[in-house]
């Protein structure tokens, strides 16, 4: 059985940067906290916890120590609270997310009503929204955009892991809602390239394996776009979840991984597939 790994599977620039900053912070003396999971990989979060990094939902009673800001960013209020408490802040926010936050703030200050295209429940979006100083709403789809009221000036940004097609459809609806529209395409290039690679690979294989946390938006989207072309698509977090029955009648299997998936997890999955293949042929 041939195993084909997508070229850009695994850590993107922002995640690689964030994990490196987190592990460096964990090695220093003193209390270290992560304001939310550093990335959407339970396995990486567990390794940091073993090094003493405690994941927090909020700053609460924390009065000292180092706070690591996750790659998805946090709200402006949380960041201000950390500064007010004079905590040491290691800001591991992805630069692409940071740019979206800045765009929202600038649009808002310029008098635009802001539309954020994305998942309202995602921490990245909640952080981006917090930088608006005026009216702001989150739109997840073309249908939701159609329900927006008329507005004079609309400013649009996107969650970095959104698909370009969804952004395009929302923008087209917004054109019907306002006379003046300003758009910032804040979708990360790595997200678009990964999706293009994954769909190209899904067309040529008999089975697709997508590796990544079940709480990872970009991994979920990878699995969705692959499943549209290859029904035998399976999302997993670890090699232990692989079912040998998935590979019955399979000559070629494609493997890709979300932006928060470490290389060692990808290697374990590929090794497990090889073991299953060897057992079939022995």
Curated annotation (Swiss-Prot):
Binding of isopentenyl diphosphate occurs at: 40, 72, 122, 216, 218, 260
Q: Which residues bind [4Fe-4S] cluster?
A: 12, 94, 188
Q: What is its EC number?
A: 1.17.7.4
- Cofactor(s) this protein cannot do without: [4Fe-4S] cluster
Residues in a coiled coil are none
Residues involved in (2E)-4-hydroxy-3-methylbut-2-enyl diphosphate binding: 40, 72, 122, 160, 216, 218, 260
Q: How is the cofactor bound?
A: Binds 1 [4Fe-4S] cluster per subunit.
Classification via Gene3D superfamilies: 3.40.50.11270, 4-hydroxy-3-methylbut-2-enyl diphosphate reductase, catalytic domain (3.40.1010.20)
Database matches in Pfam families: LYTB (PF02401)
Q: Give, as in the UniProt entry, the pathway in which the protein acts.
A: Isoprenoid biosynthesis; dimethylallyl diphosphate biosynthesis; dimethylallyl diphosphate from (2E)-4-hydroxy-3-methylbutenyl diphosphate: step 1/1; Isoprenoid biosynthesis; isopentenyl diphosphate biosynthesis via DXP pathway; isopentenyl diphosphate from 1-deoxy-D-xylulose 5-phosphate: step 6/6
Choose any GO biological process term that the UniProt entry carries and state it: terpenoid biosynthetic process
**What keywords appear on the UniProt entry?**
4Fe-4S, Iron, Iron-sulfur, Isoprene biosynthesis, Metal-binding, Oxidoreductase
Which InterPro entries did the record assign?
LytB/IspH
Q: Which residues bind dimethylallyl diphosphate?
A: 40, 72, 122, 216, 218, 260
Q: So where's the catalytic machinery, residue-wise?
A: 124 (proton donor)
Which GO MF terms does the UniProt record name?
4 iron, 4 sulfur cluster binding; 4-hydroxy-3-methylbut-2-enyl diphosphate reductase activity; metal ion binding
Name the catalysed reactions.
isopentenyl diphosphate + 2 oxidized [2Fe-2S]-[ferredoxin] + H2O = (2E)-4-hydroxy-3-methylbut-2-enyl diphosphate + 2 reduced [2Fe-2S]-[ferredoxin] + 2 H(+); dimethylallyl diphosphate + 2 oxidized [2Fe-2S]-[ferredoxin] + H2O = (2E)-4-hydroxy-3-methylbut-2-enyl diphosphate + 2 reduced [2Fe-2S]-[ferredoxin] + 2 H(+)
> PANTHER family attached here?
4-HYDROXY-3-METHYLBUT-2-ENYL DIPHOSPHATE REDUCTASE (PTHR30426:SF0)
- What function is annotated for this protein? Catalyzes the conversion of 1-hydroxy-2-methyl-2-(E)-butenyl 4-diphosphate (HMBPP) into a mixture of isopentenyl diphosphate (IPP) and dimethylallyl diphosphate (DMAPP). Acts in the terminal step of the DOXP/MEP pathway for isoprenoid precursor biosynthesis.
The protein's matches in HAMAP family, at most eight in alphabetical order, are given as:
IspH (MF_00191)
What family name appears in the similarity comment? Belongs to the IspH family.
Q: What is this protein called?
A: 4-hydroxy-3-methylbut-2-enyl diphosphate reductase
Origin organism is: Geobacter metallireducens (strain ATCC 53774 / DSM 7210 / GS-15)
| Gene designation | ispH
């Amino acid at each position: 059985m041939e195993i084909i790994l997508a070229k850009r599977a695994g850590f993107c620039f922002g995640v690689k940067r964030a994990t490196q900053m987190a592990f460096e912070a964990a090695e220093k003396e003193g209390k270290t906290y992560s304001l939310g999971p550093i990335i959407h990989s339970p396995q990486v979060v567990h390794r940091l916890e073993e090094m003493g990094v405690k994941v927090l939902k909020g700053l609460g009673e924390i009065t000292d120590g180092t706070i690591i800001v996750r790659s998805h960013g946090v709200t402006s209020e949380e960041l201000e609270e950390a500064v007010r408490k004079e905590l040491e802040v290691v800001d591991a926010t992805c630069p692409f997310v940071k740019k979206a936050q800045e765009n929202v703030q600038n649009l808002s200050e310029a008098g635009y009503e802001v539309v954020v295209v994305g998942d309202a429940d995602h921490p990245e979006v909640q952080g981006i929204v917090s930088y608006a100083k005026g009216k702001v709403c989150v739109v997840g789809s073309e249908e939701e955009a159609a329900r927006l009221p008329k507005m004079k000036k609309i400013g649009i940004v996107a969650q970095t892991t959104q698909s370009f097609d969804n952004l395009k459809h929302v923008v087209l609806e917004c054109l019907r809602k306002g006379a003046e529209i300003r758009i910032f395409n804040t979708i990360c290039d790595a997200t678009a390239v990964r999706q293009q690679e994954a769909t190209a690979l899904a067309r040529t294989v008999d089975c697709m394996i997508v590796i990544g946390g079940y709480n990872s938006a970009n991994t979920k989207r990878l699995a969705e776009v692959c499943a549209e072309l290859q029904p035998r698509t399976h999302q997993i977090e670890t090699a232990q979840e692989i079912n040998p029955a998935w590979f019955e009648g399979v000559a070629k299997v494609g493997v890709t991984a979300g932006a928060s998936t470490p290389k060692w997890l990808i290697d374990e999955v590929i090794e497990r597939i090889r073991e299953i293949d060897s057992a079939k042929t022995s």
